[in-house]
């Protein structure tokens, strides 16, 4: 071992050793299984801090379970990430070659995407290995592999045959940038500054008008009606029932519907084809849906001057037209919720398109039934179970079709106006649906398809349902819910027994990390600077179920110091003189029994934490054990003792227990000190030793003597002369004198009270006089306070008027000062 800790030297080569020895690939079927599925990262880029957290939590759990005697399986996989990957590749193609996917054609473009996938798949594996993850690479899966594709197609066809999948022209959220429909939960609403336009809609054959407020002037060309709330007194008694459109001059019926908010704008709403709620009302009333904005976000109205104009430009030009023709009353600045694509951050357009949907009523019931059954999934923290229930009770049908090339192509076939849904082509002339499935469809079946469902029954039965799912709380609806209902439908089992929802990682100011804020942190750069153990320690010990984490550089530096401290302890123990004895629990020193009791108590806490996964609780306790119990006390207390065998025995247990939290450091030190492999060991067992009162007394005495030096500005080099009221063993007395730079000398000068003993420290005549004066001041103060309290309590007027609490306070003060006075008088008597 080098004399100075260097995390790069320590961590180098260890992960490759774990893989070579197949610690997490070879499975002992005689042991109880424990399985976890790694949330598959998208093959779109590289690892970010969220991935690191998603990885370190299950890795820590897997290592604990392995050492505790389980056959562990941590199954890795990657997600083809349809929209995200295709848009990345398209962007790169255009940046490098000025080519679009249409220039290449589907076959060549998909070949480029597969190349991208291969490159980033390798990059992810390298990064997993840098983090030191205990993954079973021999069972790695991919959501667009041949095996998974076969299962996706089978499940789609089966769901269709069961009546749970349908195709229909419906209002969908269309991403203009990505050129695909997206599901409702991929839409985010943002408060956005925009103009609210107040427009005149004149009554038919009248100079009177109604005022309609809208932020979306560009949708006016698709207006088919004006609606008001039937409870709105301003409009319910109107006799004229038609209005003339200010631009198209069409007759628009005035219709009443409770959807309209009376207090929003003028209380009137124009019905157009570019809002989901509007379309629902239009269809309910049997009116025509007239779309005037196309898939590219351009106006599609050949009869009007704004035809082929970009939608937001058209908004301004149409508002200008209305103003010039005296139809615009005013335009006010306003803040309103606007729907954006969570994928591309572009403003969503609502379009009527033929799309594939999953009916959610049946699957809602499946989830709700499971959550109240004996085989229910346990949520940690439990509040996310309630969140899921609320969401499922308000769930929309799931739009599962995407207008992409990269993904699982929908197994629907068309010919002569007919449609068939099946895995293989029905024959010549049949054309397959060009849409692909939403990425979350294949991710949703990963919970069982990755565990070799219908491919390897023995493997599936052993490891499914998985023991635990670890995920960020932001995926509960996107992914967790879909895994649950698809697993219940096709395996008749829950996908996992427990699900642990962790928080998100934010920057030091609590902001979400994003490219736009330029506040992202590359975990690999952190690992290079501080080591994987330091980053792991920071992320793990700041993880409380469901709570966000703020990135903190200082805490990572502090985490590095933990490994550094352990390294230095190992250096010291290895340098101790050999005594060639075997450590036996029956013959251990008091010091070793004391530290083992401390370790036993820590073990109980660690065992509890691995049931709740609230790792934020254990971090402080482990830190205190390493820096205080182990380094500050145990190592100090054994320096004068020839017990290397015991120190090695103790430290071996410590390293095994710390392995889940500091795998690289613990593995390296274990191998160097014991020439054995840590991952071939078992979790230590403990017997409780009788508490060593002398060791506790020793620590108490040393602590208080050091404080005495600090309080009196006495140099550590200056020798103290002291004695103890009660005798302790010669061995422990020598340790006390050595660690406090003292000599034993009978005296009764300065008293330090311990729990079960007392120390007297000799002081000079000058110090004695000064201390006597201080003591006399304390006596005088107590006497003064006693007199004051007695006078107040003997005052009948005070007793009659004062609140009981105030009287009680004075009585307590009187009692306390009497007790203190007695102590000070006794001290004055026997000291001076």
Swiss-Prot record:
Keywords: Aminoacyl-tRNA synthetase, ATP-binding, Coiled coil, Cytoplasm, Ligase, Nucleotide-binding, Protein biosynthesis
Coiled coil: 760-831
Subcellular location: Cytoplasm
Domain of life: Bacteria
Single GO MF descriptor: aminoacyl-tRNA deacylase activity
UniProt-listed CDD domains: Anticodon_Ia_Val (cd07962), ValRS_core (cd00817)
Motif ('KMSKS' region): 512-516
Residues that hold ATP according to the record: 515
Catalysed reaction equations from the record: tRNA(Val) + L-valine + ATP = L-valyl-tRNA(Val) + AMP + diphosphate
Family: Belongs to the class-I aminoacyl-tRNA synthetase family. ValS type 1 subfamily.
Record's subunit section: Monomer.
NCBIfam families referenced in this protein's UniProt entry, alphabetically: PRK05729.1, valS
Protein's name in the database: Valine--tRNA ligase
Native source organism of the sequence: Mycoplasmopsis synoviae (strain 53) (Mycoplasma synoviae)
